[in-house]
């Protein structure tokens, strides 16, 4: 558990920052999400074992991960010689792929650059390996489920108790170890009355 908390610190931070940026940039979705959270929680804090799963919050998290995957590059070692787009690739070589670009590929995603949490409603799924914010296959991130539960609990509680307004819209993606917002996501935070 401690390993997942420490290893996931930067990725969780990036996910939360990008989610607040997207919600601040899309006030109509933010308002719907606030209503969803308030209806689901009332005055009770969210709990991991309470069965609390507001669908819109889950869709917002998935869409944030699609548009701004904290780990934006993946890699795999080639196990046997192959040809890829006319180029010979030898066994043992390492191939890198862009999760960021895959998640924005119009061949897989309608309106690929738009923030549209509804694309995940009704159990809709992307084609295999078109949505891989935690990698895919046997080498997928062991903390994927934990990270999503953590995000749901943190976002649920913050949205339950505070109002957020985006203070600075001029944010760009910086591709470092994680995909981080630069110069950062600045929000005006107001405690909700009665909280």
Name what the model sees in each region.
Residues 44-85:
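Conserved cytochrome P450 K-helix E-x-x-R motif and the immediately C-terminal K′/meander segment
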């Amino acid at each position: 558990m401690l390993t997942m908390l420490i290893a996931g610190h930067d990725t969780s931070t990036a996910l939360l920052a990008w989610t607040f940026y997207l919600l601040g940039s899309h006030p109509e979705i933010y308002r719907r999400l606030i209503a969803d959270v308030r209806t689901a929680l009332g005055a009770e804090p969210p709990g991991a074992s309470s069965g609390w799963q507001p669908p819109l919050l889950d869709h917002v998290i998935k869409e944030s991960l699609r548009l701004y995957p904290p780990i934006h590059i993946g890699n795999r070692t080639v196990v046997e010689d192959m040809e890829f787009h006319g180029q010979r690739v030898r066994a043992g070589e390492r191939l890198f792929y862009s999760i960021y670009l895959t998640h924005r590929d119009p061949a897989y995603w309608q309106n690929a650059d738009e923030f549209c949490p509804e694309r995940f409603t009704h159990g809709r799924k992307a084609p295999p390996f078109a949505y891989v914010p935690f990698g895919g296959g046997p080498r997928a991130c062991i903390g994927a489920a934990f990270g999503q539960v953590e995000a749901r609990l943190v976002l649920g509680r913050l949205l339950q108790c505070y109002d957020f307004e985006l203070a600075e819209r001029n944010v760009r993606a910086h591709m470092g170890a994680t995909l981080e917002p630069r110069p950062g996501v600045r929000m005006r935070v107001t405690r909700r009355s009665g909280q």
